[in-house]
Amino acid sequence: MRCAAACLVAGWTVSANGLFSDGRAIAAEMCPVTDGIGRLGASFVTADVQHTAKGYVVSWQAIGTTQVVVSLAGRTLTERDKAGWHGAASGRVVIPVRHAGQRPFFRLTPDCGPALVLAERDISSRRLSNLRDAGGYRTAAGDWVRMGAIYRSNALAGLTRADRQALDRLGIRTVIDLRHVQERTVAPDVLPGGAGYVVADVFADASDPQVDVGSLIASGREYDAIVQLNRAMVSSAAARQAYARLFHTLAADGDGAVLFHCTAGKDRTGWGAAVLLTLLGVPRETVYADYLLSNRYREHEIEAGAHGQGTAFVPLERVDAAYLDAAFDEVTRVFGTFDNYLKQGLGLDDRVISDLKTKFLQPGQ
């Protein structure tokens, strides 16, 4: 397999004689085998985008390639760009992009194999403290979860004009609200322009003893209360119905991105994201790392809660690996396997699971 067709950089054209528009030849050698099962071409092992005072830092580590060119996705490159934004199989470049409110996406193109498109994950603001892209993670098979397709957040309530404008620019077409009716009434969502609204109430059945944790909190057992709620998010009837609706909505055809959220964007949303990433093949350690990011994004809320209510309530404001352990343990206890949970617990058939993978994965080889 020759890599000419796979090694195009956004905005560069290729003539019939196999040359870039500026006359440089495309690599025509065979793509090297990059793993033990015969897959060809480059594979990105790690890649990340971070916004700093100097610009966007794009870093990567790849195998099966000798050079990676970084470009702004969807923009024709200047000669200066072509000369400066590239590196070896492992590299790091600083791109001084002034995005003027627009969220820049970067295309990482190896000299052999498919390109990878990434953006910065953190798009939070003061009121949308836990707003982030759910994509940008590598699967165990070497594919990557698409960015710009799924967002997770805290409640879309009490937003500033700037917050609303930022949401509008994300291209969100559907918002899925995992909150209880009382939460939705007190703090209704401010929807992005043109977005549809879907309710998937995880704790809809307040009479379910699994979600009745008031006595635990009253007795100072806040940690145990959250552990119990995480188990309920797996096995209670209302939760299974809500998460089934979440994933059926995600799998449905349609253009535009989807955003799902609860109140803080950490527990109900955290489990939804953990299920999605696991379904897509993201390694468990990465799933946990993503889950725990809520502590970093919500640092100010956690500190404010400790100051106002006392440190005893910190377990209610934070996420803990043990909370996610409780949910995955409940999957094993009730359903035996994660696949059984998807199919028996949530009613996702092979077609829906395949649709989710097709829609939200970009090939890594």
Name every feature range the model reports, one short phrase each:
Residues 260-262:
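The Walker A (P-loop) glycine that initiates the GxxxxGKT/S ATP-binding motif of P-loop NTPases
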Residues 23-258, 272-365:
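Cys-dependent protein tyrosine phosphatase-like superfamily
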Residues 11-24:
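C-terminal segment of classical bacterial N-terminal signal peptides
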Residues 264, 268-269:
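Ser/Thr-glycine-rich phosphate-binding loops at phosphate-binding pockets of nucleotides
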Residues 1-8, 12:
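Bacterial N-terminal signal peptides that target proteins for export
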